[in-house]
Amino acid sequence: MRNFEIVIGIENHVELKTKSKMFSSAPVSYGETPNTNVNETDMAYPGSLPTINKKGIELAIRTCNALNMEIDTLVKFDRKNYFYPDLTKGYQITQQYNPIGKNGKLNINVNGLTKEVDIERLHMEEDTAKQIHKDDLTYIDYNRAGTGLVEIVTRPVLRSADEACAYVEKLREVLLFLKVSDVKMNEGSLRTDVNISIRPFGTQEFSNKVEVKNLNSISNIKKAIEFEVERQTKLMLNNEIIIQETRRFDDTTNSTVSMRSKSDALDYKYFREPNIMPIQLKKEWVEDCIKNSPELADIKRIKYVNDYKISINDANIILTSIEMTEFFEETIKFTNNYTKVANILISDIQAQLNNENTTIDKLALLPSHLAEMINLVDQSVISSKHTKTILPIIMKDSSKSVIEIVEELNIKMISDENEIANLVNPIIESNLELLEQYSERPERVTKTIMGQLMKVTGGNVNPEAGMNIIIKLVENKIK
């Protein structure tokens, strides 16, 4: 393996987050009863005609801009012709000749080093139906047919499994924060095809490539590449031919399995889509699409670290989930203690989410309630230990404010000087011999009295106010 350079290119199919399909008014919703989210256009009934989803084009433009691509404002579609059971029309509407985006780039970080990944193209198309293989039968669910997609294709510039995984993870983050797609790999809304070849170091010519289709997790991408590199290396060392073919990844054996040879590839006979005329996008509309794009995670990350003084590790944890990110940003509208918000989110709350296998938006917890609890600690109304009692309550019930819960539980800290003095005086009177040590060991004396005060009150005394009163009363007593 040391004698060969790994060459990897990646194609990602991304389902767009639209309410209806790319060329029909049928709804888009994952997990519905099979063959219910379809209409005449999806099923290719005679006389049905496609209508372009404007939102789909907007999401494609957002993505092109985030990937630093040249945007073609003259939108054209083509037909990709082939017969397969999951394609009722006998063709797929795509953009073979005029992709909406070209010549992009995306920076990734691998082992502390930054690498710029060249992206060749981004084009819009429609998805096919879903095939379900069960026993000896194949079932077809046309709910997915016609769903809007963008396909994003890199140039063959990736040189390791780690780089490939870093690229897909970074692309997923971009798409997630743009709200272009929910990018759930396990549900197929982000699908990855990896083209892999090897060549002797110093060689410029490409060897025969192998395409591994439909990898549905980052870990499977890594395993598939590592297996394929090892397989191809053995073939090359034995002077055997590497067949240019399409393979699939078997996650039970962690190996790739041949599907078909590239020599069997179909001639798709592309031609212009006659039912959709070219559309010239207005410059102002394209600019609005870009201007109204959501803030990317990279920008948020800089703001969290530089402005909010959150550690880079904590910022990265928050930014792994768009729900967590939105909750964090809503919470800090009500408090300035940004680091405390981050700490509670990534520790106590994340632990609860892991236990329940859910996301923060599914909890009853309100950002304003979390901020209120943090503010009450900062104001010495409650102690930090009381958050362990309050947090589980507000995560399950949002009907009461935090201060109402504090009063019901009677855990409000005592801050009134007279009230504290009335509690401290009896403790001092019971420990007069302790006062004799005050001149030599003042800290020991005051801490001992503070400990007894906390014991008497169950810890519900403002520590700063309590200590000030103790020092004042002790010094008055020994005068």
From Swiss-Prot:
One of the GO BP terms on file: translation
InterPro entries per the UniProt record, alphabetical: Asn/Gln-tRNA_amidoTrfase_suB/E, Asn/Gln-tRNA_Trfase_suB/E_cat, Asn/Gln_amidotransferase, Asn/Gln_tRNA_amidoTrase-B-like, GatB, GatB_C_1, GatB_Yqey_C_2, Gln-tRNA_amidoTrfase_suB_CS
Enzyme type, top EC level: ligase
Single GO term (MF): glutaminyl-tRNA synthase (glutamine-hydrolyzing) activity
Reaction catalysed by this enzyme: L-glutamyl-tRNA(Gln) + L-glutamine + ATP + H2O = L-glutaminyl-tRNA(Gln) + L-glutamate + ADP + phosphate + H(+); L-aspartyl-tRNA(Asn) + L-glutamine + ATP + H2O = L-asparaginyl-tRNA(Asn) + L-glutamate + ADP + phosphate + 2 H(+)
The enzyme's E.C. designation: 6.3.5.-
Sorted UniProt keywords: ATP-binding, Ligase, Nucleotide-binding, Protein biosynthesis
Quaternary organization: Heterotrimer of A, B and C subunits.
Purpose of the protein: Allows the formation of correctly charged Asn-tRNA(Asn) or Gln-tRNA(Gln) through the transamidation of misacylated Asp-tRNA(Asn) or Glu-tRNA(Gln) in organisms which lack either or both of asparaginyl-tRNA or glutaminyl-tRNA synthetases. The reaction takes place in the presence of glutamine and ATP through an activated phospho-Asp-tRNA(Asn) or phospho-Glu-tRNA(Gln).
Membership in a protein family: Belongs to the GatB/GatE family. GatB subfamily.
NCBIfam families: gatB (TIGR00133), PRK05477.1-2 (NF004012), PRK05477.1-4 (NF004014)
Name the UniProt record assigns to this protein: Aspartyl/glutamyl-tRNA(Asn/Gln) amidotransferase subunit B
Record gene name: gatB
